[in-house]
């Protein structure tokens, strides 16, 4: 993996509050190497380590994107949802930002069946065919379509398992992370001071509660993905 420069600036991370961890009582001792201080009952993340692992993650996603690999970004809590959708759309990645449906990856056949149903209903809506059904049936199908749009809208173009999964909050998305581990799908995970750094392939120590922090980390990763995609197109 070639090392590149990703313009990761410590002052910028400090302004975004990337260094603020959880309260000192809510911490995982495994995070000790990534913590630089305690301040007013809060752990402070070592931003030098954050910059290092974020840079490694950017190198990884650049290389993967330059080979045409597919990405899935997962972040379902309210503070992360909008940033996840925007970042994924910008980099043409798949995303889940509402609710992780158990077995979404490990039971891919069921997910694929749901996606096919979703595509069929969308096509029927586009062509106006839904309106040809009896009123009650049409209403049921439209509700079902809205439900599928909410939970599967971000993966509607996904035709197989992703090559790399980016996870915004390890604890919130633990089910998704476990599925990736089971399937041996490489993961990049934002980890706060209450997380286990050993679970993901690349763990980025960062504040996973502040919108500005989440957005900054995602923007760096997405920029690297976009650069990799451009390289892939040039070399195709």
From Swiss-Prot:
Localization (cell): Plastid, Chloroplast
UniProt KW keywords: Chloroplast, Plastid, Ribonucleoprotein, Ribosomal protein
Biological process according to GO: translation
InterPro entries: Ribosomal_uS2, Ribosomal_uS2_bac/mit/plastid, Ribosomal_uS2_CS, Ribosomal_uS2_flav_dom_sf
Gene Ontology MF annotations: structural constituent of ribosome
A Pfam family it matches: Ribosomal_S2
Signal peptide region: none
Entry coiled-coil feature ranges: none
GO cellular component, one term: mitochondrial small ribosomal subunit
Protein family membership: Belongs to the universal ribosomal protein uS2 family.
HAMAP family assigned to the protein according to its UniProt record, in alphabetical order: Ribosomal_uS2_B
NCBIfam families from the UniProt entry: rpsB_bact
Name of the featured protein: Small ribosomal subunit protein uS2c
Organism, scientific name: Glycine max
Gene that encodes the chain: rps2
């Amino acid at each position: 993996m070639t090392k590149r420069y990703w313009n990761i600036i410590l002052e910028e991370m400090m302004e975004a509050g990337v260094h603020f961890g959880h309260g000192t009582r809510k911490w995982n001792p495994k995070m000790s190497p990534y913590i630089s201080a305690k301040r007013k009952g809060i752990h402070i993340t070592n931003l030098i380590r954050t910059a290092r692992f974020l840079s490694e993650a950017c190198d990884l996603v650049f290389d993967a994107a330059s080979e045409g690999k597919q990405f899935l970004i997962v972040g379902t809590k309210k503070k992360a949802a909008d940033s996840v959708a925007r970042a994924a759309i910008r980099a043409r990645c798949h995303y889940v930002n509402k609710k992780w449906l158990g077995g979404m990856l490990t039971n891919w056949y069921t997910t694929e069946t749901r996606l096919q149903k979703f595509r069929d209903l969308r096509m029927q809506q586009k062509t106006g065919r839904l309106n040809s059904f009896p009123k009650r049936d049409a209403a049921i199908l439209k509700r079902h379509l809205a439900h599928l749009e909410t939970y599967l809208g971000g993966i509607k173009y996904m035709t197989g398992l992703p090559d790399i999964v980016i996870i915004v909050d390890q604890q919130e998305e633990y089910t998704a992370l476990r599925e990736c581990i089971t399937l041996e799908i490489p993961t990049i995970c934002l980890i706060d001071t209450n997380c286990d750094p050993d679970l993901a392939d690349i763990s980025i120590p960062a504040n996973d509660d502040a919108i500005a922090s989440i957005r900054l980390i995602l923007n760096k990763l997405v920029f690297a993905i976009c650069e990799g995609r451009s390289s892939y197109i040039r070399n195709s």
